[in-house]
Amino acid sequence: MVLMIVSGRSGSGKSVALRALEDMGFYCVDNLPIILLPNLASSLMPRNTPAAISIDVRNMPGSSEIFEKVLTKLNKKFSTRLIFLDANHNTLIQRYSETRRLHPLSGNHLSLEKAIDEENILLEPLRSRADLIINTSEMSVHQLSEMLRVRSLGTKERKLSMVFESFGFKYGLPIYADYVFDVRFLPNPHWDPKLRSMTGLDKPVVDFLKRHSEVHHFIYQTLHYLNQWLPMLENNDRSYLTIAIGCTGGKHRSVYIAEQLADYFRSRGKNVQLRHRTLEKRKE
């Protein structure tokens, strides 16, 4: 089992690194005390899932000998790698000034500069044992994520997951969606008493919508739009692209359209997920 330990100076990008590793399929735990590392790793071993653990200065043991013993113990059972993130002194000061966050050691009545210096000393045992040291001073969030992907997986490729979700406007917008398409202008099966109790998954509703040319035009133009920009989105360091399709109740039109879009991209080898928000709520 691969066990990635992520540490480094506060403000150097540990949270970004942990999110990137999580996107790569690692089971991630933030700010775990070092003495608990062996127990956690052992509990994860049956899953054979790669894990990433972040450690900051607040979780350092009282002596470097304790850390050495823990790391030696882990190396006997796991494929352990220690990544240490660093940044220049002035860069760290600038980042803290921009975010206005408190340094973890500032609570000890230290100025920001002294807290940064003190942390640097305390983290030296970790830095000295690191398999990889990354200075993030001149790196963007995307560049750090890309470097970790290449170093961890040995490839720059990561497959984008396209999530198609139908919903009803009457129940509210999905705020996490990257794109929202409103299909309330399309012919509504709700007004046909025979179709009202059905959904966009049922053949009579599907046949009803297929008979209308505007439905075909909407699907065609939406596919054209997504196909046009998908290559750039795939290269934009994202794991998910969520496309929400909304009609009034989230039962007929949006369900059918989401199904059609998902089928198209699935047939072209894309990693596709499909959700019907309103229909799932009805089952609960």
UniProtKB/Swiss-Prot annotation:
Molecular functions per Gene Ontology: ATP binding; GTP binding; RNA binding
UniProt KW keywords: ATP-binding, GTP-binding, Nucleotide-binding, RNA-binding
Binding-site residues, ATP: G8, R9, S10, G11, S12, G13, K14, S15
Annotated region (RNA-binding), positions in chain: 266-284
Residue sites binding GTP per the record: D56, V57, R58, N59
Disulfide bonding pattern of the chain: none
Ranges that cross the membrane: none
Keyword Protease part of the UniProt annotation: no
Function: Modulates the synthesis of GlmS, by affecting the processing and stability of the regulatory small RNA GlmZ. When glucosamine-6-phosphate (GlcN6P) concentrations are high in the cell, RapZ binds GlmZ and targets it to cleavage by RNase E. Consequently, GlmZ is inactivated and unable to activate GlmS synthesis. Under low GlcN6P concentrations, RapZ is sequestered and inactivated by an other regulatory small RNA, GlmY, preventing GlmZ degradation and leading to synthesis of GlmS.
NCBIfam families: PRK05416.1
Matching HAMAP family: RapZ_like
Assembly behavior: Homotrimer.
Family: Belongs to the RapZ-like family. RapZ subfamily.
Protein name as catalogued: RNase adapter protein RapZ
